[in-house]
Amino acid sequence: QGRMYQRFLRQHVDPDETGGNDHYLNLSRRNIQCPNRHEGVRFNTDIHEDLTNRRPIDEHEGVVRVTDKTEEG
């Protein structure tokens, strides 16, 4: 698989299916590996599915659990 795809998986996929609450959002925001975190993305989405559930979606349309994150001012 390509380098960009692997980067996407690292930054946006949470295979443990956690998330959806303020603690998760704040913790994941702190753990984003950006050189200039304050100049980074103001909106982000995490996918909460394991590989088995995600694989069909990688190839075709489907539904997954996600958490949308926005930077707090």
From Swiss-Prot:
This is Lactogenin. It comes from the Eukaryota. Transmembrane segments: none annotated. Gene3D superfamilies: Ribonuclease A-like domain. GO terms for biological process: regulation of defense response to virus by host. Inhibits HIV-1 reverse transcriptase in vitro. It is found in: Secreted. The modification Pyrrolidone carboxylic acid is found at residue 1. The keyword Secreted applies. Belongs to the pancreatic ribonuclease family. InterPro entries: RNaseA-like_dom_sf. It is an enzyme of class 3 (hydrolase). GO terms for molecular function: endonuclease activity. Milk. Secretory RNase specific towards pyrimidine bases, with higher activity towards poly C than poly U. Inhibits cell-free translation. Keywords: Antiviral protein, Endonuclease, Hydrolase, Nuclease, Pyrrolidone carboxylic acid, Secreted. GO terms for cellular component: extracellular region.
